[in-house]
Amino acid sequence: MAWIQIRINSTNTQAEQMSDYLAEIGAVSVTFMDSQDTPIFEPLPGETRLWGNTDVVALFDAETDMQQIVDLLKEAQYLVESSVYKIEQIEDKDWEREWMDNFHPMRFGKRLWICPSWREVPDENATNVMLDPGLAFGTGTHPTTALCLEWLDSLDLQDKTVIDFGCGSGILAIAALKLGAKSAVGIDIDPQAILASRNNAEQNGVADRLQLFLSEDKPADLKADVVVANILAGPLKELYPVIRQLVKPNGVLGLSGILATQASSVCDAYAQSFVLEPVEEREEWCRITGKLQ
């Protein structure tokens, strides 16, 4: 069966609304692509993280009257005079297989690999975390997750306790446990994140060492040797008192989900309690690390 695809260049503020509307008018699937043609698979819990230049790609049945679709989009003001869009017929494919073929094991630091479950692990002697991409939360494909994974790989986690604040898929907590941590705690505001983290921990054989809490249910006296938070700059600054209290004396902290342009304001908030290391940047994102003084 053939399909017709419409690809519309959009802004991050319109993309989600446009996606919902395309589904309403008959699209069988809608995906987001960044300007480099990369699928956007890694939202933070509770949101779809989109870049300023986002393409919305919708598939329709081959019999669809695409002029009618365009007219509806114009009527809803998702297409205006300056809009850039492209319509093309595409061949039928095994979409699931093609999607799976795009994902390969990824290495972070010296020891750590994140591997899709359908791939062979490249090094059986390495620290391998089995995690499937494209589910709801982070799987290592985004620079902020990669920065956090590399930081965890650089630490001596043997017999340490770890808190993953804003755990999403649980990838950071699970990686820490695989890297030698004694125990870990995942905290999130989203019940789906708690469920995803639990399932992923079971898949990796570490569920007995991972505790999971919704934010409002976390123990008041909870502390750890290592705290990592891959959320956003605004919440990191707002939650400084909460996050600071999670770190044991002489414990270390890793923060990401921060644009490089936001680093100084986040550093200002945390420098009052932490000795901060140089900011690590990747693409437009960064990681801030430090030790509680």
Swiss-Prot record:
S-adenosyl-L-methionine binds at residues 145, 166, 188, 230. It is an enzyme of class 2 (transferase). It is found in: Cytoplasm. GO terms for biological process: methylation. The keyword Transcription does not apply. Methylates ribosomal protein L11. This is Ribosomal protein L11 methyltransferase. It comes from Pasteurella multocida (strain Pm70). The lineage of its organism: Bacteria, Pseudomonadati, Pseudomonadota, Gammaproteobacteria, Pasteurellales.
